[in-house]
C-alpha cells in the first residue's frame, strides 16, 4: 500500500479577486499563507511523512510547499519543480475577472471555457508579452511544447506522461510523495487515478489548501481517498470553487 498526498496551492491574490490566473505567476494571499500553514500542521499532527515533493514552477504552488515543509520540519527533503505541473493555461482569459467575463460572454460560454474537457479558451497571440517562450524559466523547453491556451485535455496530455514516467516509479520504489500543484493540473491527475470520464470531470472541484490523501494499491490504483479536513468545510470550499464563474 502506498500513500500519496495532493494539495492545491493556498488561495492566491488572483483567486481572491476571482481572476483567471493560469500561467501568470501570482503569489499567495494572506489567507492562502494561512491555508498552507494549516495544511502542514494537519499533516504533521496526523503523522504524515514525506521523502520527496513535486511542484510546479509557479510561486503560489512553490510557496505553499515551502510553508508545508516548514510546518512539518521537512525543509531538507528533495523538491522537483516542473512546468508539467503548472496550472492549465487560460490563454486570452488570463487576468480577466470571472464575473465580468460572464457578463460579457454569458455564463454558459464561460462555463464551457472553465470546465469543458476539450474546448480551450481563446489563445494568446504570439506577440503577447505573457507568451511562455519569452520567460527564462521556460527557455529549456521546446517552443512547440509551450501552450498559448489549454483545455483540461491538454493539461492531461502534458502531465500524465510525466506522472507515468517520473512520479509513479518513485512511488513504487517506496518513496512517500507530496505534490503541491494547481486546481486543473490536480484535476488532470485525479481524473487519471479515479478513472473519471470526460463527461463527469467538469463536476470535479478541488479546493485550495486542503490535503487530498490517496491510498494506492500495488498497481497505484486508489483503495480510498479523502480530504484531511472537516467534511462540511471541504464541501463549502468545493462549492465556492464551483460558483466562481456564475453570475451573481
From Swiss-Prot:
Family, similarity comment: Belongs to the phosphoglycerate mutase family. BPG-dependent PGAM subfamily.
Keywords: Gluconeogenesis, Glycolysis, Isomerase
Enzyme class: isomerase
UniProt protein name: 2,3-bisphosphoglycerate-dependent phosphoglycerate mutase
UniProt-recorded Gene Ontology molecular function terms: phosphoglycerate mutase activity
Lineage: Archaea, Methanobacteriati, Methanobacteriota, Stenosarchaea group, Methanomicrobia
Annotated site residue numbers, Transition state stabilizer: 182
CDD domains: HP_PGM_like (cd07067)
Keyword Chaperone: no
Native species: Methanospirillum hungatei JF-1 (strain ATCC 27890 / DSM 864 / NBRC 100397 / JF-1)
InterPro entries linked: His_Pase_superF_clade-1, His_PPase_superfam, PG/BPGM_mutase_AS, Phosphogly_mut1
Active site residues of this protein: 9 (tele-phosphohistidine intermediate), 87 (proton donor/acceptor)
Pathway: Carbohydrate degradation; glycolysis; pyruvate from D-glyceraldehyde 3-phosphate: step 3/5
Recorded coiled-coil stretches: none
E.C. no: 5.4.2.11
Catalytic activity reported: (2R)-2-phosphoglycerate = (2R)-3-phosphoglycerate
Residues annotated as binding substrate: 8-15, 21-22, 60, 87-90, 98, 114-115, 183-184
Function: Catalyzes the interconversion of 2-phosphoglycerate and 3-phosphoglycerate.
One of the protein's GO biological processes: glycolytic process
SMART domains: PGAM
Amino acid at each position: 500500500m502506498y500513500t500519496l498526498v495532493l494539495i492545491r496551492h493556498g488561495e492566491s491574490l488572483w483567486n481572491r479577486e476571482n481572476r483567471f490566473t493560469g500561467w501568470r505567476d501570482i503569489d499567495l494571499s494572506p489567507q492562502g499563507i494561512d491555508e498552507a500553514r494549516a495544511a502542514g500542521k494537519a499533516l504533521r499532527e496526523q503523522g504524515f511523512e514525506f521523502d520527496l515533493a513535486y511542484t510546479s514552477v509557479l510561486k503560489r504552488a512553490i510557496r505553499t510547499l515551502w510553508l508545508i515543509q516548514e510546518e512539518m520540519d521537512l525543509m531538507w527533503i528533495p523538491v522537483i519543480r516542473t512546468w508539467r505541473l503548472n496550472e492549465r493555461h487560460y490563454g486570452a482569459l488570463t487576468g480577466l475577472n470571472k464575473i465580468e467575463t460572464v457578463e460579457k460572454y454569458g455564463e454558459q460560454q464561460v462555463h464551457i471555457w472553465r470546465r469543458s474537457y476539450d474546448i480551450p479558451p481563446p489563445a494568446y497571440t504570439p506577440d503577447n508579452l505573457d507568451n511562455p517562450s519569452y520567460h527564462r524559466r521556460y527557455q529549456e523547453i521546446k517552443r512547440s511544447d509551450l501552450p498559448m491556451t489549454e483545455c483540461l485535455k491538454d493539461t492531461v496530455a502534458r502531465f500524465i506522461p510525466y506522472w507515468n514516467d517520473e512520479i509513479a516509479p518513485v512511488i513504487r520504489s517506496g518513496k512517500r510523495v507530496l505534490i503541491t500543484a494547481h486546481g486543473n493540473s490536480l484535476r488532470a491527475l485525479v481524473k487519471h487515478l479515479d478513472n473519471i470520464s470526460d463527461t463527469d470531470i467538469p463536476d470535479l472541484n478541488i479546493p485550495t489548501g486542503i490535503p487530498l490523501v490517496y491510498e494506492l494499491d500495488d498497481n497505484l490504483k486508489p483503495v480510498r481517498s479523502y480530504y484531511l479536513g472537516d467534511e462540511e468545510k471541504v464541501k463549502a470550499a468545493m462549492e465556492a470553487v464551483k460558483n466562481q464563474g456564475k453570475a451573481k
